[in-house]
Amino acid sequence: MINTILWDVDGTLLDFLAAEKYGMETCLDEIGVKLTEEMLSVYSRINRSWWEKHEKGLCTREEIFEGRLKDFFGEYDIAYTDYDHFNRRYQIALGEAVFPVDDSLTLLKELGKSCKQYMVTNGSRVAQELKLAKSGIDKLCDGVFISEIVGIQKPEKAFFDYVQKATGYVKEETLIVGDSLSSDIKGGNNAGIKTCWYNPKGGSVNGDVSVDYTIKNLWELKEILAK
């Protein structure tokens, strides 16, 4: 029986793409650049590729923040090089943008009556702490684990070992829910816990991962927990 849930935040409980759009629109506007849908798509692709490198241990968090902006600005000949300032402003904008998915806050309230719930996220400390506070998620869960603070990121087993030591969760009674196969599901596999892939777009499993459950709507989780 599942009595502990490890939740991913961005792309699972909160709409990250909507937040990303808000963040880039806000920050580009401040330097006199208008964001188009094509530019947003290119930035999303660049950002995703950098985070995938990070998950594989091929780059640091700091290299992500500078590298993705260098690549994106270079793509559109944007003559702006204060990457550190732009990134700091961007992290704050991301934290200000809260777009719950599938009425997720109500779901957290309901599940909190019978389960322990912890947030496990690779997002930046600034953005995560802001959005968790603004959304109220920090008050609806039993703890928050941000990889930047922990010093290790998903999907590394050591990240989950840290969470287990801090919470005392029992592997056989714990489920991770997330949208990323390479971070959340692979991390759950490494940790030896059950996995639930949030897959609203009906994608296919790829890579060396094992998925125990797949859901298209977060509320389907209630059926899984009732088994």
Which positions does each model-derived feature cover?
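N-terminal helical cap/lid subdomain that shapes the substrate entry/recognition surface
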Residues: I2-D102
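Short, conserved clusters of charged catalytic residues that mark active-site
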Residues: D102-D103, A158
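Catalytic-core regions built around general acid/base machinery
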Residues: D103-S114
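Glycine-centered short loops/turns at secondary-structure junctions
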Residues: S114-C115, G192
